[in-house]
């Protein structure tokens, strides 16, 4: 993306001046502060989050990538780092990572288990090889599947009419 880079092994965060300039359009200091807080919520999550085991790496496995970026945006969503429901992308799939997955993970927290985000992060050490479906079953029970929960979420937020 054009606004930051991932946290590297030394936990540095690079914040693009181009993104700062865009966020400060119309000299709106409040918007700039809000966006900077959101970026920090996302990027600092990378410094502390756990990584899926047994499935490759960020650059080699889309599941790994979707988990990493989805969790970082879930922390941002959960802490008011986006402009509420209006910032939620419509449709898509949890494998899209970032906000699409982030809003879904927070919905799981709000509707299935208040400790979901913490448990989901921890699942990367307990479900090996890690998968979305394996983590869901580990946290919520064998009767749940990631795809069924995604469908339930899409209906609940009005993206799918039944």
Q: What function would you assign to each model-found segment?
A:
Residues 2-9:
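Short, small-residue-biased leader/transition segments that mark boundaries at the very start
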Residues 19-22, 47, 54-55, 79-82, ...:
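Solvent-exposed loop/turn segments at secondary-structure junctions
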Residues 19-40, 55-64:
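Short pre-active-site segment immediately N-terminal to the catalytic Zn-binding motif
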Residues 38-51, 69-73:
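Active-site recognition of the HExxH zinc-binding catalytic motif
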Residues 50, 73-81, 110, 114:
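Glycine-rich, acidic and aromatic/proline-enriched surface loops and short helix-turn segments
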Residues 50, 54-59, 91, 120:
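Surface-exposed cleft-lining segments at the edges of enzyme active sites
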Residues 59-102:
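Post-HExxH zinc-binding segment in Zn-dependent metallohydrolases
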Residues 101-162:
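Pan-zinc metallopeptidase signature
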């Amino acid at each position: 993306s054009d606004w930051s880079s991932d946290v590297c092994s030394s936990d540095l965060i690079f914040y693009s001046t181009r993104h700062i300039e865009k966020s400060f359009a119309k000299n709106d200091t409040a918007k700039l502060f809000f966006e900077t807080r959101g970026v920090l919520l996302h990027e600092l999550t990378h410094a502390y989050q756990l990584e899926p085991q047994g499935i490759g790496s960020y650059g080699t496995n889309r599941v790994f990538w979707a988990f990493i970026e989805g969790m970082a945006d879930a922390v941002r969503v959960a802490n008011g780092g986006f402009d509420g429901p209006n910032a939620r992308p419509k449709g898509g799939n949890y494998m899209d990572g970032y906000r699409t997955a982030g809003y879904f993970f927070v919905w799981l927290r709000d509707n299935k288990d208040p400790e979901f985000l913490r448990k989901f992060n921890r699942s990367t050490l307990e479900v090996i090889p890690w998968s979305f479906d394996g983590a869901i079953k580990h946290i919520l029970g064998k009767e749940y599947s990631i795809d069924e929960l995604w469908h339930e979420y899409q209906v609940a937020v009005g993206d799918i009419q039944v």
